[in-house]
Amino acid sequence: MANSTGKPTSSTQEDEEATSATEILAQLMQDIIDREEDIDDEDDIDDEVIDDEDYEVASLPLLQESQANQKQSREREEETEKNQPKRFKKQNMMKINIHDFSEETLRLIEVWYEAELDPQDIFGDNEVTRLFSRPIKKQLMSSDVDKDQCMLMLSKEQVKEKMLPFLEDSENPVKGIDVSVYGPDGKVQQMEFKMWNGDKTPVLTSGWKQFVEDYGLSMTCDFVTVWMFRHIKTRKLCFAIHYVKFSLRD
């Protein structure tokens, strides 16, 4: 339809634009179909098949970046482990200075570290609990036996995983918890279990110094195994500690 000037009406313009848009859309659809057919044809040619893994990485730059970061992380971990004895790399829970010990002693330390000691041996026939925590093993350092500080420092991650589940809601290690600590001969001493240096490091203190003196513990050569448990009768929070000495290199 035209107006008095002979120009197409707005309705005609809209029809033509709709027709043009339809034609463009149809052409785009045909182009897509043609490209898919080309891809199907290429898939039939063995030497032009795209490897799935390469395709995914090329299509996902974030994945490619993630893989690169993972590789860098593995390289950093390998670099960190270079100075650690091979036998301790898998556990990666207790690092020691290998230069302090002979190869024979390092093998003995490995056996000790992997062995599952029975804490009930400390108590003999006396039943104090039916459930011990999983043990924490560590080499005593200067901070553990220094007379000016003298507190047994424990791994925060291991305490969180192995020991904190034994605590009751009313027990707050940040404020400090009075505990009974059983030595390797079954003798008991009173100590405090608390978070030291803010809430960064779990420690046994307020009695640990006497424990060190009673058993003649020393840095480097002495290694301890520590369990937590709740006394079967008193329900009091307790620790059991066993230690072993290894000879230092001459």
Swiss-Prot record:
Q: Which UniProt keywords apply?
A: DNA-binding, Nucleus, Transcription, Transcription regulation
Cellular component terms (Gene Ontology): nucleus
Q: Where's DNA bound on this chain?
A: 137-245
Q: Region annotation Disordered: residue ranges?
A: 1-90
Task: Point out the signal peptide segment.
Answer: none
- Record's compositionally biased regions (Polar residues): 1-12
Its main subcellular localisation, reduced to a broad class, is: nucleus
Q: Where in the cell is it found?
A: Nucleus
Keyword Nucleus carried by entry: yes
Superkingdom as given in the UniProt entry: Eukaryota
Q: Where is the composition biased (Acidic residues)?
A: 34-56
One matching Pfam family: B3
**Per its UniProt record, what InterPro entries does this chain match?**
At2g31720-like, B3_DNA-bd, DNA-bd_pseudobarrel_sf
Q: Where is the composition biased (Basic and acidic residues)?
A: 72-84
Gene Ontology MF terms: DNA binding
| This protein's name | Putative B3 domain-containing protein At4g03170
Could you tell me which species this protein originates from?
Arabidopsis thaliana
Q: What is the lineage of its organism?
A: Eukaryota, Viridiplantae, Streptophyta, Embryophyta, Tracheophyta
